[in-house]
Amino acid sequence: MSRLRTLFLLPLLASLGSCSMVVLNPAGDVAEQQRDLLMVSTALMLIVIIPVMALTIFFAWRYRQSNREARYEPDWDHSTHLELVIWAVPLLIIICLGAVTWMGTHLLDPYRPIGRVAAGKPLPPDVRPLEVEVVALDWKWLFIYPEYGVAVVNELAAPVDRPISFRITSASVMNSFYIPALAGQIYAMPGMETRLHAVINKSGDYEGFSANYSGAGFSGMRFAFHGLDDAGFQAWIAKAKDSGGKLDRNGYLELEQPSENQPVRHYAAVDSDLYKAILNMCVEPGKMCMSEMSQIDAKGGLGMAGIRNTLPLLYDKFARRGTIFGPAPSYVASICTTEEALAASKADQSATPMTSTPIVGAGLQRPLPLSIRLPSPSATGTLRSPFNS
């Protein structure tokens, strides 16, 4: 029977061999520091967990009913030494854990530029980070390289030992950008920009994906991340430039349409202001950018005239989530002149009736004219117009 159990467990153990331990065996310095922080925190917590588990088993065995040699002290209720151990050890662990976590949180702040390439390898003073603009779409990833003027869908590459500066946003709902081998995950939100600084230290092919549910195609939001040497990275950029095609605003509006499991796509050129337009939610022609709107609001706004030139503002253009709690928010479509605003105001106030015929219901007679008899001025005094001073 024991041999059959062993044979039954062998396939299960073999299946575990295919599991990736990328979180505990990363390829980037930031991810390695996060791994170390995780291991230290776990070790500190095990100082409490292991003795508690061991003592639970020990007391259950030591003071079992059949053990007549165990001491029986029903009136025992206090021990100063035991109280000191019970409270002092967890308190010291919490202090150490808090200090380690606080320092690690600030050192690994994703908005903070990295200060080294790897452990014992400082950052060269003349190195310039690789800028990558990341856009989360439904349901794919767009990566723009402003330094090289190329854009790629569902594929990312970076040279080894060169710092990477990610600028991340979303064109639809809230999402999450995560490459376990490189660094921790960070959110991507529409109309907002998050930052991530990291570096890849080992050549290889890794996987990135969305770590935040975002709809029907969420499971297919995966992309390949390549860590390349300088020559390999330049060849990858050259391949993107040779692919042809330009990603302009019209092309982007077609690309952002919801689609699932999209193949890798390269663009040899990209509109230099495309990412800013995506971030400010003004890719559509004629739409006012959020940055322009905020500048107008900072100077006092447009007043009542501004409410006449609005169109629906849709964060999720294709599903319109969240509108059940009220009308959809709006944005200013254009700026009118003073004359145009006054003309629009007068047009709204004028109401010319289409017909003066009284409304008569089915089978009802025409209503009789209503007469009101006003009191004479001699009885009430001179009537004063509300417009007279």
Residue positions per predicted region:
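Hydrophobic alpha-helical segments
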Residues: 1-52, 59
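Non-transmembrane, membrane-proximal soluble domains of secreted or membrane proteins
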Residues: 20-38, 63-365, 369-389
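Structural signal for membrane-spanning alpha-helices in multi-pass inner-membrane proteins
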Residues: 13, 56, 97-101
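Generic alpha-helical scaffold signal
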Residues: 51-54, 75
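Cytosolic-side junction of a single-pass transmembrane alpha-helix
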Residues: 53-67
